[in-house]
Regions:
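Alpha-helical transmembrane spans
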Residues: 140-230
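OB-fold/S1-family single-stranded nucleic acid-binding modules
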Residues: 111-151
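Charged, low-complexity cytosol-facing tails and large interhelical loops of integral membrane proteins
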Residues: 217-276
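Short, contiguous, well-structured surface segments enriched in hydrophobic/aromatic residues
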Residues: 69-77
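Short nucleic-acid-contacting surface segments enriched for D/E, G, S/T with interspersed K/R
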Residues: 94-108
Length: 276
């Protein structure tokens, strides 16, 4: 997908997103439903333990919650947000971790679902007190940074191949003057070979654009100046702790790897890409 086409898709997606702020007044997760299953209770039993989400969203939409996803470390969730006008909003989503809980003041970024007016799909949840952010998208590098990274990788590979070819040629000819690289035609071919590999790297990097579209749309909705360069992984709790030399000897918990500091990411974006 070309940069222009991807930008257009991101713009359209960002316009579809909407934001709701308020208190988490009800929450249902995969773990909750699995515990209910283990207790020989059905989805309807969630109502008995205080959750009205089953009645609002429906058993069918929550059916996957009670299923065991062995080897897949994600958590489905349904959430009820009560805004300042005491209006209730319902969302369903799937994140690597669900740390937010009832009583938290959050900001939910969501996408309306076609043919569904009872609830929407949550694409990101922001804890307004701690500036923690959770999303279903794990993007290590931004779209442009990922393309440049893969270009450099393929470029380095091509240069290494050329160097090995030169060494092989030298051992055969046993003379620098007689090496094929002294031929202008071979020099041009070598240069074109490196350029082709760099172009292939760009195209391979472009094939991962789809993974960045949703995250870029979220960051665009939040007012980031350069979403295509954003790397939330640099602002995960574990990365920030490592940078500040906190818990250096410990392997980071899963929640630390998938919980991001939005305030630090926004500050970096403003300092690097904001209007001077």
């Amino acid at each position: 997908m070309s940069l222009k086409k991807t930008d257009q898709v991101i713009d359209e997606f960002s316009k579809r997103l909407f934001i709701v702020e308020g208190e988490v007044t009800d929450l249902l997760t995969s773990e909750t439903m699995q515990n209910l299953n283990a207790s020989m209770q059905t989805a309807t039993g969630a109502i008995a333990v205080g959750s009205a989400l089953v009645g609002q969203i429906g058993n069918a939409a929550l059916a996957s919650f009670a299923a065991s996803d062995e080897g897949i470390e994600v958590s489905d969730f349904a959430i009820e947000i009560t805004d300042n006008c005491n209006q209730k909003h319902y969302f369903k989503g799937c994140f690597p971790v669900v740390i937010f809980k009832k009583g938290d003041m959050v900001k939910v970024i969501a996408e309306p679902l076609s043919g569904q007016n009872k609830y929407a799909r949550a694409v990101a949840v922001i804890d307004q007190q701690n500036n923690y952010t959770w999303t279903g998208q794990e993007v290590v590098k931004g779209r442009i940074r990922y393309r440049v990274f893969v270009m450099k990788l393929f470029g380095a590979i091509s240069i290494i191949v050329v160097i090995f070819a030169l060494l092989f040629d030298f051992f055969i000819t046993n003379s620098i003057k007689q090496m094929l690289i002294n031929n202008i035609g071979i020099q041009i071919i070598s240069f074109l070979f490196i350029l082709v590999f760099i172009f292939i790297g760009w195209r391979v990097g472009a094939s991962f654009d789809g993974q960045s579209i949703e995250l870029e749309a979220i960051l665009k909705k939040l007012g980031f100046n350069k979403p295509s360069m954003a790397s939330l992984n640099d602002f995960s709790v574990s990365s920030v702790n490592r940078k500040n030399k906190i818990n250096m000897d410990e392997y980071p918990d899963r929640w630390e790897q998938y919980t991001y500091r939005l305030d630090l990411a926004k500050k970096y974006d403003e300092e690097k890409y904001g209007k001077k």
